[in-house]
């Protein structure tokens, strides 16, 4: 990886256009209500193009996309990064194959993360098994169990990142979920990240409906 870049930067057009299109797609699916969510891509010099704070993802303009360095320091004047930028930076730092990160706030993800588990205690994961769409995550069969980790929400991003780090180091094939908040999913490029998000959201919607039918 290259060292931290400190020069003033504007995102390349391809990166900004890619992020804007991803925001429109996520908004159309109801995964980023109000100004929720954030979207990023890794740039060739290992800086990160990411949505700036406070923008509705369905109405993004390329001028809403900024560049940060590997520590989350803004390099684009006049734009403020989301506090959650640190979580994007962490994923890129710990997974050299990650080329894009998407974070959404769907109803299914939010509700399931807060559903009571055994003895009414909040669960640490959502177990997904038997679904054909699990193959979207690189497995060869539906006859497998994958767990989606759930982290307790925290407004202190450094503390939240410290909780996420061991999960990322062990490997998180589905991504991870922040309780009452939303999912983080990533892939080699934006198309892969969005496909994984779509697969995960389908699985969570199925799981929510299955629990209703119990």
From Swiss-Prot:
Disulfides per UniProt: none
InterPro entries: Aldolase_class_II_sugar_metab, Aldolase_II/adducin_N, Aldolase_II/adducin_N_sf, MethylthioRu-1-P_deHdtase_MtnB
This protein's pathway: Amino-acid biosynthesis; L-methionine biosynthesis via salvage pathway; L-methionine from S-methyl-5-thio-alpha-D-ribose 1-phosphate: step 2/6
Catalytic activities: 5-(methylsulfanyl)-D-ribulose 1-phosphate = 5-methylsulfanyl-2,3-dioxopentyl phosphate + H2O
Binding positions (Zn(2+)): 103, 105
GO cellular component: a single term: cytosol
Cofactor binding note: Binds 1 zinc ion per subunit.
Gene Ontology MF annotations: aldehyde-lyase activity; methylthioribulose 1-phosphate dehydratase activity; zinc ion binding
Domain of life from the UniProt record: Bacteria
Keywords from the UniProt entry: Amino-acid biosynthesis, Lyase, Metal-binding, Methionine biosynthesis, Zinc
E.C. no: 4.2.1.109
Pfam families: Aldolase_II (PF00596)
This protein's record includes keyword Amino-acid biosynthesis: yes
GO biological process: L-methionine salvage from methylthioadenosine; pentose catabolic process
Named cofactor requirement(s): Zn(2+)
Protein family per UniProt: Belongs to the aldolase class II family. MtnB subfamily.
PANTHER family: 3-OXO-TETRONATE 4-PHOSPHATE DECARBOXYLASE-RELATED, FUCULOSE PHOSPHATE ALDOLASE
Role description: Catalyzes the dehydration of methylthioribulose-1-phosphate (MTRu-1-P) into 2,3-diketo-5-methylthiopentyl-1-phosphate (DK-MTP-1-P).
Alphabetized NCBIfam families for the sequence: PRK09220.1, salvage_mtnB
HAMAP family: Salvage_MtnB (MF_01677)
Designated name of the protein: Methylthioribulose-1-phosphate dehydratase
Organism: Granulibacter bethesdensis (strain ATCC BAA-1260 / CGDNIH1)
Gene from which this protein is expressed: mtnB
């Amino acid at each position: 990886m290259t060292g931290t870049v400190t020069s003033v930067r504007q995102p390349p057009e391809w990166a900004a256009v890619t992020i804007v299109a991803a925001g429109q797609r996520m908004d159309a699916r109801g995964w980023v209500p109000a100004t929720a969510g954030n979207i990023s891509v890794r740039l060739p010099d290992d800086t990160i193009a990411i949505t700036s704070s406070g923008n509705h993802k369905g109405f993004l303009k390329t001028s809403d996309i900024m560049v940060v360095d590997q520590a989350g320091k803004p390099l684009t004047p006049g734009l403020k990064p989301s506090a959650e930028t640190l979580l994007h930076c962490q994923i890129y730092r710990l997974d050299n194959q990650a080329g894009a990160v998407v974070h959404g706030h769907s109803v299914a993800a939010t509700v399931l993360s807060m559903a009571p588990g055994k003895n009414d205690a909040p669960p640490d994961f959502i177990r997904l098994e038997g679904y054909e769409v699990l193959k979207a995550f690189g497995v060869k069969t539906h006859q497998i169990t994958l767990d989606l980790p759930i982290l307790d929400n925290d407004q202190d991003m450094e503390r939240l990142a410290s909780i996420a780090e061991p999960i990322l180091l062990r490997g998180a094939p589905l991504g991870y979920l922040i309780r009452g908040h939303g999912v983080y999913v990533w892939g080699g490029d934006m198309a892969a990240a969005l496909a994984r998000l779509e697969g995960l959201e389908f699985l969570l919607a199925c799981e929510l409906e299955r629990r209703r039918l119990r």
